[in-house]
């Protein structure tokens, strides 16, 4: 397992570099073929190709496993943040998010095949290329395959205590553009309409839409504007990250954003954006799935599963609204996502592979 993980981590795969992600895809496809899978390469022009692997003749009522091959780290990251194993941890870009999840998936299937165990349901694994940039090309494939599945396992990293991620917030973004009027800051200051000043008023109004009781947060994370300190800025833009949990919250926020009005005469506001991933609530369907998984884990492995959640989103968010049970956080245990502190606990590779194999075999 560690050898394959090392190979995958040292094959850097930033989302926007198609050739790099395809190199990982080639490795994954090869490993799946070694396990006698029916492998299909789903091509993309600008982003990496997706890899679809099937065990069994029919995917209906089967098990769907979701993995992604892309990472947030740019090419060359290995020079300053190399793959390293020390003190029971494996460090490196993409170890936790989520190349360990790929290794765990392949190991679980390999173990079932090696002991001649036939899963009661067909197994399909989709390895996507663009999860870190919104799953723009993979979403339709995820939703199509999920509609045929009886259970979906998402191989993102677990919570630090090993808990599965049974709920996730939905994530979206608003982009706000303010137009003012440029003028010389010394000679014609009065004639100008300061777009940054106007945007300051709007930022305060937007941040006030955060509602912690409803688990709704808005974060103005990027602001741009102006060309020089001696020019009254004509334009300013912001990017707003949005996280929602409750039904109807996104619609409420859309309505509030459309109501934004200029505070200064002679300025205008333009709002755009959308919800990328809907919420993944821990509703009745997923509660039943977690209960079943917990019983299997206890009976087969003597392991007690725990349920948790996070404000971050994944491809599991696309599955929940379809009414299909989904269990996320099935991957390795570690921390430091998207940073040079990213690592997994080495022993969690085998532990989570055993868990996934048990769930596939007994679902």
Language model regions located:
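Acidic/His- and Gly-rich active-site-bordering loop/insert found
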Residues: 1-93, 114, 316
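Acidic, glycine-rich active-site loops and adjacent beta-strand->loop/helix elements
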Residues: 69-71, 89, 126-133, 156-159, ...
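Phosphate-handling active-site elements
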Residues: 88, 108-124, 206-215, 363
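Glycine/serine-rich anion-binding loops at beta->alpha junctions
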Residues: 89-103, 184
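Acidic/histidine-rich catalytic neighborhood of metal-dependent amide-processing enzymes
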Residues: 98-169
């Amino acid at each position: 397992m560690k050898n394959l993980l090392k190979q995958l981590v040292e094959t850097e795969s930033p989302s926007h570099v198609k050739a790099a992600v395809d190199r990982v895809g080639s490795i994954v496809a090869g490993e799946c073929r070694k396990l006698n899978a029916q492998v299909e390469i789903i091509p993309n022009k600008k982003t990496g190709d997706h890899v679809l692997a099937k065990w069994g003749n029919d995917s209906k009522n089967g098990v769907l496993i979701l993995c992604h091959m892309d990472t947030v780290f740019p090419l060359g990251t290995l020079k300053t943040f190399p793959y390293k194993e020390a003190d029971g941890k494996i460090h490196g870009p993409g170890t936790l998010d989520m190349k360990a999840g790929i290794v765990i998936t392949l190991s679980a299937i390999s173990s079932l095949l090696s002991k001649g165990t036939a899963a009661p349901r067909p197994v399909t694994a989709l390895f996507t290329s663009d999860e870190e940039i919104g799953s723009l090309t993979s979403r339709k494939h995820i939703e199509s395959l999920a509609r045929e599945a009886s259970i979906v396992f998402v191989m993102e990293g677990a919570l630090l205590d090993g808990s599965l991620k049974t709920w996730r917030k939905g994530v979206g973004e608003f982009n706000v553009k303010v137009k003012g009027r440029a003028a010389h800051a010394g000679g014609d200051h009065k004639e100008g309409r300061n777009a940054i000043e106007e945007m300051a008023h709007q930022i305060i109004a937007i941040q006030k839409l955060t509602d912690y009781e409803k688990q709704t947060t808005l974060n103005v994370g990027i602001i741009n504007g102006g060309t020089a300190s001696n020019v009254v800025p004509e334009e300013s833009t912001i990017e707003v990250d949005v996280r929602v949990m409750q039904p109807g919250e996104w619609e409420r926020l859309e309505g509030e954003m459309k109501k934004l009005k200029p505070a200064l005469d002679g300025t205008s506001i333009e709002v755009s954006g959308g919800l990328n991933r809907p919420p993944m609530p821990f509703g009745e369907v997923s509660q039943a799935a977690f209960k079943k998984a917990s019983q299997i884990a206890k009976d087969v492995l003597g392991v007690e599963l725990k349920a948790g959640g996070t404000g971050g989103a994944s491809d599991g968010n696309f599955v929940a609204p379809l009414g299909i049970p989904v269990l996320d956080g099935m991957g390795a245990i570690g921390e430091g996502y998207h940073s040079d502190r990213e690592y997994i606990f080495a022993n969690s590779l085998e532990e989570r592979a055993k868990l996934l194999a048990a769930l596939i075999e007994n679902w």
